[in-house]
Design a protein with these regions (language model features):
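N-proximal low-complexity "stem/linker" segments adjacent to membrane-targeting elements
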Residues: 1-27
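Glycine-rich, basic loop-to-helix element that forms the pyrophosphate-binding segment
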Residues: 63-81
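Conserved donor NDP-sugar-binding/catalytic core segment of glycosyltransferases
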Residues: 96-131
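Short, flexible, basic/aromatic active-site loop/helix in glycosyltransferases
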Residues: 137-167
Length: 167
């Protein structure tokens, strides 16, 4: 058995149709990088697990004991992975070009100090999907504090109608 360079882990919950398109896109735009596809089903309980397993016998299909969330599925998939690198995908991802996976793999090999990377994502109409950053905890606390102060001042203003000015 040759060395697997990349383990592609996909966590599924009742997304069989888009998952099939995802796997078919790997067959259409097959990477040169050696890879395995691992699908972790988060206990969909919709009766489609076995038929999907027969339809895509080339993938590792793992049934989780419950729906413990995306991260649990990723952890279970990575436990079963034998690739040098891990690629986590959502089931609604489809490849649109051949070099996409190979380029990411080459980047990871050439930059061993990089621990995580991503790629450009596009909507199905071809438009670029915007990257979304999470708010820092301090910014979140600041927003919540402002909302609380505003709500509190409105409550106080109602008690004292002559002081209608909130700000």
């Amino acid at each position: 058995m040759s060395k697997i360079e990349l383990s592609i882990i996909i966590v599924n919950y009742r997304s069989w149709e888009v998952l099939a398109k995802c796997i078919e896109s790997f067959n259409k735009y097959k990477p040169n990088t050696s890879y395995e596809i691992i699908v972790v089903d988060n206990d969909s309980q919709d009766g489609k697990f076995e038929s999907f397993k027969q339809q895509f016998s080339e993938i590792k299909l793992i049934k989780n004991k419950g729906n413990y969330g995306f991260s649990s599925g990723c952890n279970l998939g990575s436990d079963k992975a034998i690739g040098e690198f891990l690629l986590f995908l959502n089931p609604d991802v489809t490849l649109t070009s051949s070099p996409a996976i190979d380029d990411m793999y080459s980047f990871a090999v050439a930059n061993p100090d990089v621990g995580i990377t991503s790629c450009r994502t596009l909507y199905s109409n071809g438009k670029r999907e915007r990257e979304i950053a999470f708010l820092s905890p301090w910014l979140t606390i600041g927003w919540l504090r402002s909302i609380y102060k505003l709500a509190f001042s409105i409550k106080i203003a109602k008690k004292f109608p002559e002081n209608k000015k909130i700000w």
